């Protein structure tokens, strides 16, 4: 496994791989890797000849400086995990390598609508930062396929739209959520939880599943369903942040024509903002 820190060296290797006709897969990450990331890597390995994993804590997608400062950086551990998975390349640049002129005045990619709705409404600039860095990685790595987790449902939808709108010839693979045995969705931010909070954390998935059962049974009293879910979260020790029930295919409000819904749930538990989602076929 080769660890690359410079754009120049990355381009040299990508040029060689292209000349050799290799099929390239990209797995973009911010590091602090867990089994959910390894699932992305496994999917990438099954889909291509060469796997490139990027590890970059992207300052453009953080709306709070304190959140950026405390985001875990575990490059050595991450590389050991990736080496065991027989990843070919790790691209781990510094912010100065990615943004030589700094982020102020940086050309950016914005996906209208999807960038500012739902999660984007509470995190201004976040999705613009995501689409900009992913677009930049696509240009540098020139992958045939890229793998993203379905846990970040809105992010995946945004990237699919960006790829379609910008004409990228890249297959986007969404990889299902990986959960701990107690149901908690794996996330780098779970590391912010204390031992006691970790015991409470699976309650998010339980509330999510209860909402899914109601929708599958044909209940369409969305305001009431959401109010009950918020109350249940707060009673369990969470601070409910945002619960949305949207059309799984458009992320717009449900209509009579909607066949599948996605439940998007976010709640604070101590210093950790936990997110989860579930797709459900709507009952009649």
UniProtKB/Swiss-Prot annotation:
Keyword check for Nucleotidyltransferase: no
GO MF, one annotated term: ATP binding
Reaction(s) catalysed by this chain's protein: (R)-pantoate + beta-alanine + ATP = (R)-pantothenate + AMP + diphosphate + H(+)
EC numbers, comma separated: 6.3.2.1
Biological processes, Gene Ontology terms: pantothenate biosynthetic process
Active-site residues, as the UniProt record annotates them: 37 (proton donor)
Predominant cellular place of this UniProt entry's protein: cytoplasm
Gene3D superfamilies: HUPs (3.40.50.620), Pantoate-beta-alanine ligase, C-terminal domain (3.30.1300.10)
GO terms under cellular component: cytosol
UniProt keyword DNA repair, yes or no: no
Highest taxon, organism lineage: Bacteria
Pfam families in the record: Pantoate_ligase
Residue sites binding ATP per the record: 30-37, 149-152, 178, 186-189
Coiled coil, from the record: none
Subcellular location: Cytoplasm
Binding site for beta-alanine: 61
Residues annotated for (R)-pantoate binding in this entry: 61, 155
UniProt cross-references to NCBIfam families, sorted A to Z: panC
Subunit structure of this chain's protein: Homodimer.
Function per UniProt: Catalyzes the condensation of pantoate with beta-alanine in an ATP-dependent reaction via a pantoyl-adenylate intermediate.
Family to which this protein belongs: Belongs to the pantothenate synthetase family.
Protein name: Pantothenate synthetase
Organism encoding this protein: Klebsiella pneumoniae (strain 342)
Origin organism lineage: Bacteria, Pseudomonadati, Pseudomonadota, Gammaproteobacteria, Enterobacterales
